[in-house]
């Protein structure tokens, strides 16, 4: 990026294009917006490319509750370049290639300093505010001066955005930016669940419920750890061929199992159950099947899917008593600033398959087409280029 552009805009609002969601479920509108300069502990970044995640789809449709606010700028998977920095910003400078990440890592609280969790006790409970340290204060306004709300502290469906340093990761400029964007949410979530949460070991058996991008990323993580059998469960058999690229060895379509439960089929395939199961859909009923599909005494189930209705989970107490374990996984147990550069390094060493996640590439102006592709199940990850 031209250095004169940096100097001419530093400390001033920037006018740029953004895709604004003005009402739940309605088509996004490309409009001119004003992006304020970063405040203390904030960075303004130029988005190079962004991608769609099912979470964007969920919040696009959400028409009730405190986190349903419009107009807003969605988007949270992206890669960008630092355009300017606010006060008290260490570790970032103009021109750095960065990933914005929805999950905070403040580096200072008890949990961030702990090796046991990736939770941030200081910030992670708040999903409602526009800006991390300034509450409902927004850095976005439309051309008429109306405030535009942020989304998950990222808002990447804009040519420029402002992100708190707790949500920002500096990465190597050697990785292609479209591949890098995938690591800011879904792919990292899946790989991290296999590596950090489950700690899959060589020779283990795996069952993955739901073969979207997160489920496929779990398989990629398990493959790299040397899992012997990776079973994919999905009602869409078309995903099975793609799944082989990520290490799946077997597939189950629940609609073709007759009267047998999925857990029964898995136990027959694995002589009593898998070592690890991963629920990547977000259904309480499916979580129970994932739990029962693991081995008695040692089986571990990891929940990655978000149950949007917060339905209660029903598990047999006797199954728990006999040693099965269940746990949740938010952002794959990863501490963003520490672990994402490691994933970048694995890609640069040609060990990590990121290329196969990208099924479509479009110009940013075609963002509504990208939403339609994802909603119809035709897209795994669609890269939206800002300048192509």
From Swiss-Prot:
Entry's family note: Belongs to the zinc-containing alcohol dehydrogenase family. Class-III subfamily.
EC number(s) stated in the UniProt entry for this protein: 1.1.1.1
Family annotation (Pfam families): ADH_N, ADH_zinc_N
PANTHER family per UniProt: ALCOHOL DEHYDROGENASE, ALCOHOL DEHYDROGENASE-LIKE 1-RELATED
Assembly and oligomerization: Homodimer.
Highest taxon above the source species: Eukaryota
Enzyme class: oxidoreductase
SUPFAM superfamilies per UniProt: GroES-like (SSF50129), NAD(P)-binding Rossmann-fold domains (SSF51735)
Database matches in InterPro entries: ADH-like_C (IPR013149), ADH-like_N (IPR013154), ADH_Zn_CS (IPR002328), GroES-like_sf (IPR011032), NAD(P)-bd_dom_sf (IPR036291)
Coiled coil: none
Protein name, as recorded: Alcohol dehydrogenase-like 1
Entry binding sites for NAD(+): 55, 210-215, 234, 239, 304-306, 331, 381
Keyword Signal: no
Gene3D superfamilies linked: Medium-chain alcohol dehydrogenases, catalytic domain, NAD(P)-binding Rossmann-like Domain
MF-aspect GO terms: alcohol dehydrogenase (NAD+) activity; zinc ion binding
Keywords for this protein: Cytoplasm, Metal-binding, NAD, Oxidoreductase, Zinc
Residues that coordinate or bind an alcohol: 55, 76
Compartments reported by the entry: Cytoplasm
Gene Ontology, cellular component aspect: cytoplasm; nucleus
Cofactor: Zn(2+)
Residues engaged in binding Zn(2+) 2: 106, 109, 112, 120
Record note on cofactor: Binds 2 Zn(2+) ions per subunit.
Reactions catalysed, as given in the entry: a primary alcohol + NAD(+) = an aldehyde + NADH + H(+); a secondary alcohol + NAD(+) = a ketone + NADH + H(+)
Binding, Zn(2+) 1: 53, 55, 76, 185
């Amino acid at each position: 990026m031209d250095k004169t552009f940096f100097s001419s805009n530093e400390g001033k609002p920037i006018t740029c294009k953004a895709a604004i969601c003005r009402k739940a479920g309605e088509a996004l509108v490309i409009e001119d917006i004003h992006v304020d300069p970063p405040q203390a502990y904030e960075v303004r970044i130029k988005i190079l490319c962004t991608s769609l995640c099912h979470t964007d789809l969920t919040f696009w449709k959400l028409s009730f509750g405190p986190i349903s606010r419009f107009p807003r700028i969605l988007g949270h998977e992206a890669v960008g370049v630092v355009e300017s920095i606010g006060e008290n910003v260490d570790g970032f400078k103009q021109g750095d290639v960065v990933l914005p990440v929805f999950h905070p890592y403040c580096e200072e609280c008890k949990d961030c300093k702990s090796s046991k969790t990736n939770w941030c006790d200081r910030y992670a409970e708040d999903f409602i505010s526009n800006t991390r340290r300034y509450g409902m204060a927004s850095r976005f306004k439309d051309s008429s001066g109306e405030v535009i709300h942020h989304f998950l502290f990222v808002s990447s469906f804009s040519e420029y955005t402002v992100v708190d340093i707790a949500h920002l990761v500096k990465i190597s400029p050697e990785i292609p930016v479209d591949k890098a964007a995938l690591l800011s949410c879904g792919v990292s979530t899946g790989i991290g669940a296999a590596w950090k949460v489950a700690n899959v070991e060589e020779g283990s058996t795996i069952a993955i419920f739901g073969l979207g991008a997160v489920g496929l990323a779990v398989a990629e993580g398990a493959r790299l750890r040397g899992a012997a059998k990776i079973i994919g469960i999905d009602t869409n058999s078309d995903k099975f061929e793609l799944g082989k690229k990520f290490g799946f060895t077997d597939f189950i379509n629940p609609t073709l199992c007759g009267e047998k439960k999925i857990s029964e089929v898995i136990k027959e395939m694995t002589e009593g159950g898998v070592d690890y199961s991963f629920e990547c859909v977000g259904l309480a009923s499916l979580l129970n099947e994932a739990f029962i599909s693991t081995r008695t005494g040692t089986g571990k189930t990891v929940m990655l899917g978000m149950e949007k209705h917060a339905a209660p989970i029903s598990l047999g107490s006797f199954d728990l008593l006999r040693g099965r374990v269940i746990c949740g996984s938010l952002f794959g147990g990863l501490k963003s600033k520490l672990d994402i550069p490691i994933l970048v390094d694995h890609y640069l060493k040609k060990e990590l398959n990121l290329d196969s996640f990208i099924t479509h590439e479009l110009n940013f102006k075609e963002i509504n087409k990208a939403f339609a592709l994802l909603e119809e199940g035709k897209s795994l990850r669609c890269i939206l280029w800002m300048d192509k």
